[in-house]
Protein backbone atom coordinates (compact mmCIF):
# COMPACT_ATOMS: atom_id res chain seq x y z
CA UNK A 1 0.00 0.00 0.00
CA UNK A 2 1.46 3.41 -0.99
CA UNK A 3 1.89 6.28 1.40
CA UNK A 4 -0.93 8.12 -0.35
CA UNK A 5 -3.28 5.13 0.04
CA UNK A 6 -2.49 4.77 3.74
CA UNK A 7 -3.09 8.46 4.27
CA UNK A 8 -6.43 8.30 2.44
CA UNK A 9 -7.50 5.21 4.44
CA UNK A 10 -6.67 6.86 7.78
CA UNK A 11 -8.46 10.02 6.70
CA UNK A 12 -11.62 8.10 5.75
CA UNK A 13 -11.51 6.11 8.99
CA UNK A 14 -11.29 9.33 10.94
CA UNK A 15 -14.30 10.73 9.08
CA UNK A 16 -16.33 7.60 9.84
CA UNK A 17 -15.43 7.81 13.53
CA UNK A 18 -16.41 11.47 13.62
CA UNK A 19 -19.76 10.61 12.01
CA UNK A 20 -20.56 7.76 14.40
CA UNK A 21 -19.44 9.48 17.59
CA UNK A 22 -22.62 11.61 18.09
CA UNK A 23 -24.78 8.54 17.42
CA UNK A 24 -23.09 6.48 20.13
CA UNK A 25 -23.33 9.39 22.57
CA UNK A 26 -27.13 9.41 22.17
CA UNK A 27 -27.48 5.70 22.94
CA UNK A 28 -28.63 5.18 26.56
CA UNK A 29 -25.97 3.65 28.78
CA UNK A 30 -28.29 0.93 30.14
CA UNK A 31 -27.06 -2.66 29.99
CA UNK A 32 -29.51 -3.95 27.41
CA UNK A 33 -27.67 -7.12 26.38
CA UNK A 34 -27.21 -8.62 29.88
CA UNK A 35 -30.91 -8.06 30.59
CA UNK A 36 -31.87 -9.93 27.43
CA UNK A 37 -29.49 -12.78 28.27
CA UNK A 38 -30.97 -13.04 31.76
CA UNK A 39 -34.45 -13.56 30.30
CA UNK A 40 -33.16 -16.35 28.09
CA UNK A 41 -31.33 -18.08 30.94
CA UNK A 42 -34.46 -17.98 33.10
CA UNK A 43 -36.23 -20.11 30.51
CA UNK A 44 -33.71 -22.95 30.73
CA UNK A 45 -34.10 -25.85 33.17
CA UNK A 46 -31.17 -27.24 35.10
CA UNK A 47 -29.99 -30.54 33.63
CA UNK A 48 -27.74 -33.32 34.82
CA UNK A 49 -27.15 -34.64 38.31
CA UNK A 50 -23.64 -33.41 39.04
CA UNK A 51 -24.96 -31.28 41.91
CA UNK A 52 -27.64 -33.73 43.03
CA UNK A 53 -27.99 -34.07 46.78
CA UNK A 54 -28.06 -37.49 48.51
CA UNK A 55 -28.31 -38.31 52.19
CA UNK A 56 -25.93 -40.54 54.18
CA UNK A 57 -27.87 -43.64 53.09
CA UNK A 58 -27.59 -42.75 49.42
CA UNK A 59 -31.23 -41.66 49.06
CA UNK A 60 -31.79 -38.99 46.42
CA UNK A 61 -33.26 -35.80 47.85
CA UNK A 62 -36.32 -34.45 46.01
CA UNK A 63 -38.43 -31.40 46.78
CA UNK A 64 -41.63 -29.98 45.32
CA UNK A 65 -44.74 -27.90 45.90
CA UNK A 66 -48.50 -28.04 46.00
CA UNK A 67 -49.21 -24.75 44.16
CA UNK A 68 -52.63 -23.33 45.03
CA UNK A 69 -54.85 -20.29 44.59
CA UNK A 70 -58.22 -19.02 45.80
CA UNK A 71 -60.90 -18.86 43.11
CA UNK A 72 -64.16 -16.96 43.52
CA UNK A 73 -67.22 -19.10 42.99
CA UNK A 74 -70.92 -18.34 43.30
CA UNK A 75 -73.17 -21.00 44.84
CA UNK A 76 -76.91 -20.32 45.23
CA UNK A 77 -76.30 -16.62 44.85
CA UNK A 78 -73.60 -16.58 47.52
CA UNK A 79 -70.04 -15.77 46.52
CA UNK A 80 -67.39 -17.92 48.16
CA UNK A 81 -63.73 -18.70 47.61
CA UNK A 82 -62.60 -22.21 46.81
CA UNK A 83 -59.08 -23.61 46.64
CA UNK A 84 -57.68 -24.84 43.35
CA UNK A 85 -54.33 -26.62 42.97
CA UNK A 86 -52.05 -26.71 39.95
CA UNK A 87 -51.01 -30.03 38.39
CA UNK A 88 -48.57 -30.65 35.54
CA UNK A 89 -48.41 -33.53 33.10
CA UNK A 90 -45.73 -36.14 33.57
CA UNK A 91 -42.72 -35.59 31.32
CA UNK A 92 -42.59 -39.29 30.48
CA UNK A 93 -45.70 -41.41 30.58
CA UNK A 94 -49.26 -40.50 31.40
CA UNK A 95 -50.81 -38.84 34.40
CA UNK A 96 -50.71 -35.59 36.32
CA UNK A 97 -48.60 -34.66 39.30
CA UNK A 98 -47.30 -31.77 41.35
CA UNK A 99 -44.06 -30.06 40.32
CA UNK A 100 -40.97 -31.55 41.97
CA UNK A 101 -37.35 -32.32 41.25
CA UNK A 102 -33.88 -32.85 42.62
CA UNK A 103 -32.60 -30.77 45.50
CA UNK A 104 -29.07 -29.69 44.59
CA UNK A 105 -26.03 -28.97 46.73
CA UNK A 106 -25.75 -25.27 45.87
CA UNK A 107 -29.24 -24.32 47.09
CA UNK A 108 -31.46 -24.52 50.14
CA UNK A 109 -34.49 -26.80 50.23
CA UNK A 110 -36.77 -23.78 49.84
CA UNK A 111 -34.81 -22.47 46.86
CA UNK A 112 -35.02 -25.88 45.20
CA UNK A 113 -38.79 -26.03 45.73
CA UNK A 114 -39.31 -22.62 44.11
CA UNK A 115 -36.92 -23.38 41.24
CA UNK A 116 -38.53 -26.70 40.37
CA UNK A 117 -42.00 -25.15 40.47
CA UNK A 118 -40.97 -22.40 38.06
CA UNK A 119 -39.23 -24.87 35.73
CA UNK A 120 -42.05 -27.42 35.57
CA UNK A 121 -45.21 -25.38 36.19
CA UNK A 122 -44.25 -21.80 35.34
CA UNK A 123 -45.58 -20.29 38.57
CA UNK A 124 -44.10 -18.76 41.69
CA UNK A 125 -45.36 -17.19 44.87
CA UNK A 126 -45.14 -17.40 48.65
CA UNK A 127 -43.64 -20.61 49.95
CA UNK A 128 -45.55 -21.69 53.04
CA UNK A 129 -45.56 -24.71 55.35
CA UNK A 130 -43.61 -27.89 54.75
CA UNK A 131 -46.24 -30.60 54.30
CA UNK A 132 -44.03 -33.54 55.19
CA UNK A 133 -41.47 -36.06 54.03
CA UNK A 134 -42.14 -39.25 52.06
CA UNK A 135 -39.91 -42.10 50.92
CA UNK A 136 -40.62 -43.71 47.57
CA UNK A 137 -38.81 -45.77 44.96
CA UNK A 138 -38.30 -44.54 41.40
CA UNK A 139 -40.05 -46.79 38.85
CA UNK A 140 -37.39 -46.19 36.20
CA UNK A 141 -34.21 -46.42 38.26
CA UNK A 142 -35.31 -48.32 41.41
CA UNK A 143 -33.62 -45.64 43.51
CA UNK A 144 -35.07 -44.67 46.88
CA UNK A 145 -35.96 -40.98 47.17
CA UNK A 146 -36.74 -38.71 50.10
CA UNK A 147 -39.51 -36.42 48.87
CA UNK A 148 -40.32 -33.14 50.64
CA UNK A 149 -43.37 -31.05 49.73
CA UNK A 150 -44.37 -27.45 50.51
CA UNK A 151 -47.55 -25.46 50.11
CA UNK A 152 -47.12 -22.57 47.65
CA UNK A 153 -49.61 -19.70 47.38
CA UNK A 154 -49.28 -18.68 43.73
CA UNK A 155 -48.90 -14.97 43.01
CA UNK A 156 -47.48 -15.05 39.48
CA UNK A 157 -48.19 -17.30 36.50
CA UNK A 158 -45.83 -17.08 33.53
CA UNK A 159 -46.92 -17.51 29.91
CA UNK A 160 -43.54 -18.99 29.02
CA UNK A 161 -41.51 -21.27 31.26
CA UNK A 162 -38.62 -23.72 30.83
CA UNK A 163 -40.65 -26.93 30.36
CA UNK A 164 -43.68 -25.42 28.63
CA UNK A 165 -43.08 -27.54 25.52
CA UNK A 166 -42.76 -30.75 27.53
CA UNK A 167 -45.57 -30.35 30.04
CA UNK A 168 -49.11 -29.07 30.30
CA UNK A 169 -50.45 -27.45 33.43
CA UNK A 170 -54.01 -27.40 34.71
CA UNK A 171 -55.82 -25.81 37.63
CA UNK A 172 -58.17 -28.33 39.22
CA UNK A 173 -60.40 -28.68 42.25
CA UNK A 174 -59.21 -30.58 45.29
CA UNK A 175 -61.51 -33.49 44.49
CA UNK A 176 -60.23 -33.74 40.92
CA UNK A 177 -56.63 -33.58 42.13
CA UNK A 178 -57.33 -36.55 44.38
CA UNK A 179 -58.51 -38.52 41.37
CA UNK A 180 -55.90 -37.65 38.75
CA UNK A 181 -52.66 -37.25 40.73
CA UNK A 182 -50.71 -40.38 39.81
CA UNK A 183 -48.19 -40.65 42.65
CA UNK A 184 -49.38 -42.10 45.95
CA UNK A 185 -47.00 -39.99 48.01
CA UNK A 186 -48.15 -36.82 46.28
CA UNK A 187 -51.75 -37.74 47.04
CA UNK A 188 -50.74 -38.04 50.68
CA UNK A 189 -49.07 -34.63 50.45
CA UNK A 190 -52.32 -33.29 48.99
CA UNK A 191 -54.27 -34.69 51.96
CA UNK A 192 -51.81 -33.05 54.33
CA UNK A 193 -52.33 -29.79 52.44
CA UNK A 194 -56.14 -30.12 52.59
CA UNK A 195 -56.10 -30.87 56.32
CA UNK A 196 -53.85 -27.89 56.94
CA UNK A 197 -55.89 -25.42 54.89
CA UNK A 198 -59.30 -26.68 56.00
CA UNK A 199 -58.31 -26.39 59.65
CA UNK A 200 -57.00 -22.87 59.03
CA UNK A 201 -60.22 -21.87 57.24
CA UNK A 202 -62.34 -23.35 60.05
CA UNK A 203 -60.35 -21.42 62.65
CA UNK A 204 -60.80 -18.18 60.73
CA UNK A 205 -64.55 -18.74 60.37
CA UNK A 206 -64.89 -19.57 64.06
CA UNK A 207 -66.24 -23.10 63.48
Swiss-Prot record:
Keyword Secreted attached: no
GO CC entries: cytosol
Listed InterPro entries: DDP-like_NUDIX, NUDIX_hydrolase-like_dom_sf, NUDIX_hydrolase_CS, NUDIX_hydrolase_dom
Positions of the Nudix hydrolase domain: 58-194
Keyword field: Hydrolase, Magnesium, Manganese, Metal-binding, NAD
Residues spanning the membrane: none
Tissue expr: Expressed in roots, stems and leaves.
Positions that bind Mg(2+): 116, 120
Motif Nudix box mapped to chain: 101-122
Molecular functions per Gene Ontology: ADP-ribose diphosphatase activity; metal ion binding; NAD+ diphosphatase activity; NADH pyrophosphatase activity
Cofactor(s) required for function per UniProt: Mg(2+); Mn(2+)
Family per similarity comment: Belongs to the Nudix hydrolase family.
Catalytic activity: ADP-D-ribose + H2O = D-ribose 5-phosphate + AMP + 2 H(+); NAD(+) + H2O = beta-nicotinamide D-ribonucleotide + AMP + 2 H(+); NADH + H2O = reduced beta-nicotinamide D-ribonucleotide + AMP + 2 H(+)
Signal peptide residues on this chain, from the entry's feature table: none
Listed name of the protein: Nudix hydrolase 4
Natural source organism: Arabidopsis thaliana
Classification via PROSITE patterns: NUDIX (PS51462), NUDIX_BOX (PS00893)
EC code(s) of this entry: 3.6.1.-, 3.6.1.13, 3.6.1.22
Amino acid sequence: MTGFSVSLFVSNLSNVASYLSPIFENIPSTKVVPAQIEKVVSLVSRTGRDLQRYDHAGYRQVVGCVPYRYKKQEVNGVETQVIQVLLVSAQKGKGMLFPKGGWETDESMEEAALRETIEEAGVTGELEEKLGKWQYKSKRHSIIHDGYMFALLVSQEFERWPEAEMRQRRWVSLDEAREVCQNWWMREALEAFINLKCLADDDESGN
